């Protein structure tokens, strides 16, 4: 049952979905308002550890066996190379962009190009738009209609989004239009059997985009 999709009252096999007629999705671009350089820190006991304070804490963790030496080394390398966090040359597709476990908040601080896919839902897009607006990243979001560049956030919350369960060919065709190399992150989560369906949908889209 998980390998089938219903569109316009017709049942289709998942493997045939990409060849179905699909509505074109438009792209809305939003630039974050922050001019801050990319930053990285470790949240710990209500503090944001960075620099020497973080190095001291890493040393304690390592001495007490809380982190393995390779873990401590990796953290020290991150501190030594702040340039690693400038992702202005990367384009990351987030399937389920508003996911609590996802990297949206960090990517929004690291100048990333974020291609956000999530349900057309006011609450979901309120989170995505507010997060990106406060940061230094650039958002690319799907919309069923072409929206003017000066469209307000309040309107965008109502207009953006695409459904991974019902718009598989639309999302796949939309992603293929991007000329950049895409980093694909399948982080959408749904409860129960819908999670199996959304996982298979993400796999199908990623396979199609990567071919």
Residue ranges and their predicted role:
Residues 156-158, 163-211:
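Extended alpha-helical scaffolding regions
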């Amino acid at each position: 049952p998980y390998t089938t999709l219903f569109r316009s009252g017709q049942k289709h096999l998942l493997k045939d979905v990409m060849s179905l007629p699909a509505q074109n999705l438009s792209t809305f671009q939003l630039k974050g308002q922050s001019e801050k350089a990319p930053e990285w820190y470790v949240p710990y006991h209500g503090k944001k550890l960075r620099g020497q304070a973080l190095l001291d804490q890493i040393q304690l963790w390592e001495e007490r066996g809380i982190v393995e030496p390779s873990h401590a080394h990796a953290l020290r390398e991150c501190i030594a190379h702040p340039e690693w966090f400038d992702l202005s040359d990367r384009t990351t597709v987030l399937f389920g962009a508003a996911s609590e476990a996802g990297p949206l908040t960090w990517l929004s601080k690291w100048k990333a190009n974020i291609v956000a896919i999530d349900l057309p839902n006011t609450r979901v897009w309120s989170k995505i738009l507010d997060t990106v607006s406060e940061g230094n990243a650039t958002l690319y979001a799907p919309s069923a209609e072409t929206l003017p560049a000066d469209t307000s956030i309040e309107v965008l919350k109502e207009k953006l989004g695409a459904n991974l369960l019902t718009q598989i060919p639309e999302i796949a065709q939309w992603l293929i239009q991007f000329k950049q190399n895409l980093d694909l992150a399948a982080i959408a989560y749904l409860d129960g059997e819908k999670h199996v369906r959304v996982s298979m949908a993400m796999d199908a889209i990623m396979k199609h985009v990567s071919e």
